[in-house]
């Protein structure tokens, strides 16, 4: 297969396209992008047959900012007959052997999601035929490749596969998170999703645990503080505005009525720093850089608001500058990740982990 199919948020196709064009080029996989505004997906068509396999193997999904999920894909199947949509799909997947799972999906648009009920019903007979053809194992296996069938419209679908060790565990790349009734704001879901995105499940007990100290800059009314509190942390919430009363009643939050850009922590045993302020992204990045250089945290999660234009270019420039400044100031052991999360809109979420190979004291 020579196509790479990438799911993204509707309206961010240009950013996703610019990113995959650059990243594929770094792996010497030539090709061109096919993308339309508000389709919520991008197709990167490689010049060489089977080159998409190189990308799904060697390009880490977690290293892509704007792609939620990706898979090596066939050419678009069109005019699938209502009487038998399955046969052309099974034929297009003939080179896929012993996959462990099949997902019948759509792009994340209102128009495409109208096909969701059909996709659920269609999955059952398709699964049976794929088992008969040998493309799918009789029993689900999380270690085997995943078959993707993505309907972009009635009778029109891309089909292909991803590798389970380089794929989102979520259907369409979207985590299904529930808004807690007592959360102070919907922004709470951003940090909830970020923890799942940036901290592997098997490490969460160690890195996101009860009793830790955390700081939330720009905390009001407490959406992100809520996620820290529910995980048993003690939080210094910094904001001139009021905090949610129920959060304050937990006894786990100390409210500092200060400007987040001027606040300095009294204690130096802070593990988590979080920040979701409506500010220019470069200014927020400079703030996090200062905290990192001072060694005031171990891990940070923060949001960068995106400009209206050149969003991919702006984000990559800020991240590159951040890494340069940290290194120039003696901070050389760190890991940076960035993702346009499902619960993000005109922003991206960044994770900065200082001394990732050194235990927290």
Swiss-Prot record:
One of its GO terms (biological process) is methylation. The keyword Cytoplasm applies. The active site is at 305 (proton acceptor). Its EC number is 2.1.1.186. One of its GO terms (molecular function) is S-adenosylmethionine-dependent methyltransferase activity. It holds the Pfam family FtsJ. Transmembrane segments: none annotated. Belongs to the class I-like SAM-binding methyltransferase superfamily. RNA methyltransferase RlmE family. RlmM subfamily. This is Ribosomal RNA large subunit methyltransferase M. It comes from Shewanella putrefaciens (strain CN-32 / ATCC BAA-453).
């Amino acid at each position: 297969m020579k196509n790479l199919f990438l799911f993204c948020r509707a309206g961010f196709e240009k950013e996703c396209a610019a990113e995959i064009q650059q990243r594929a080029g770094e792996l010497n996989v030539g090709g061109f992008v096919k993308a339309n505004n508000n389709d919520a997906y991008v197709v990167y068509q490689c010049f060489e047959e089977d080159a998409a396999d190189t990308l799904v193997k060697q390009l880490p999904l977690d290293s892509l900012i704007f792609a939620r999920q990706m898979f090596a894909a066939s050419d678009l199947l069109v005019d699938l007959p209502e009487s038998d949509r399955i046969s052309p799909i099974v034929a297009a997947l003939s080179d896929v052997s012993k996959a462990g799972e099949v997902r019948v999906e759509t792009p994340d648009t209102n128009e495409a999601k109208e096909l969701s009920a059909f996709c659920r019903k269609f999955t059952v007979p398709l699964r049976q035929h794929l088992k008969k053809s040998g493309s799918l194992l009789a029993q689900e296996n999380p270690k085997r490749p995943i078959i993707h069938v993505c309907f972009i419209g009635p009778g029109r679908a891309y089909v292909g596969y991803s590798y389970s060790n380089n794929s989102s565990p979520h259907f369409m790349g979207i985590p299904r998170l529930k808004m807690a009734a007592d959360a102070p704001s919907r922004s709470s879901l951003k940090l909830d999703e970020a923890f799942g995105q940036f901290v592997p499940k098997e490490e969460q007990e160690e890195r996101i645990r009860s009793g830790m100290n955390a700081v939330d800059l720009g905390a009001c009314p407490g959406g992100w503080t809520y996620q820290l509190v529910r995980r048993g942390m003690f939080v210094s919430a910094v904001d001139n505005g009021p905090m949610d009363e129920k959060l304050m009643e937990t006894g786990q939050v100390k409210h500092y009525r200060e400007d987040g850009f001027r606040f300095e922590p009294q204690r130096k045993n802070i593990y988590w720093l979080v920040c979701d302020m409506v500010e220019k992204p470069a200014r927020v990045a400079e703030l996090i850089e200062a905290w990192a250089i001072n060694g005031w945290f171990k891990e940070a999660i923060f949001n960068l608001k995106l400009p209206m234009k050149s969003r991919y270019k702006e984000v990559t420039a800020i991240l590159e500058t951040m890494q340069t400044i940290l290194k120039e100031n003696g901070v050389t052991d760190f890991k940076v990740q960035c993702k346009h999360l499902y619960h993000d809109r005109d922003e991206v979420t960044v994770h900065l982990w200082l001394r990732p190979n050194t235990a927290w004291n």
